[in-house]
């Protein structure tokens, strides 16, 4: 089944050659209740992030309708305002709706205290809304850090050295989200901060959080509770994304386990990304949501 997006959004041209997508006009003629997914895009380059996430959602056998949400208390300068006006809504516009699933992206603000982020108060309102009106929510990188702080009070810790590269993770707990994954799960990371691992382990002991994937050196990378998925890495990254960040940062720190001996990029996490997103849509969204929202 297709991903339903506007024909004039940039991702449409990117995906139409290799994914099953459908424009809004055609979708209206089908008598199928699609899965309603809200994407809270906190990244500065919103179009790039749209392309990454929509390409993963387009691999699902389910029909998925997308709503894009951006903060209104802070509007960045890296995305054309015309694009935001055409394709994005604010929290007030979506408050009357319920959603089957939501995805909250990362943001390049992890070195700041949460309270100093320009849109922090608005983000707390968004989290309040997701808690009450969404069947299952997925939080990515800084979005996951912010959500762990919001839901469980877990502290963010600044790192002396950036976690940057593609890391192998062990499966810690059995879960449907891990169905059909490799024994060692590869995931890109790009962050200057982490979450307090002792607090996370204590929450797991209390039965509040479940650690699904973990790396011995960098700690927990995929966690969940009954309704929320927390991903501290970037499964959505395209092949070149870490390299582009390496160039942007003036070649300061080379991404680990990312280049082969000849300097070519090893794009070896994509199947894991497709599987986790498909499992989330199937088990946590589709099979858990009521037919009438």
Swiss-Prot record:
GO cellular component annotations of the record: cytoplasm
UniProt organism field: Campylobacter jejuni subsp. jejuni serotype O:2 (strain ATCC 700819 / NCTC 11168)
Pathway assigned in UniProt: Amino-acid biosynthesis; L-methionine biosynthesis via de novo pathway; O-acetyl-L-homoserine from L-homoserine: step 1/1
Protein name: Homoserine O-acetyltransferase
Primary location group: cytoplasm
Compartments, record wording: Cytoplasm
Protein role: Transfers an acetyl group from acetyl-CoA to L-homoserine, forming acetyl-L-homoserine.
The keyword Transcription regulation belongs to this UniProt entry's keyword annotation: no
GO MF term set: homoserine O-acetyltransferase activity; homoserine O-succinyltransferase activity
EC nos: 2.3.1.31
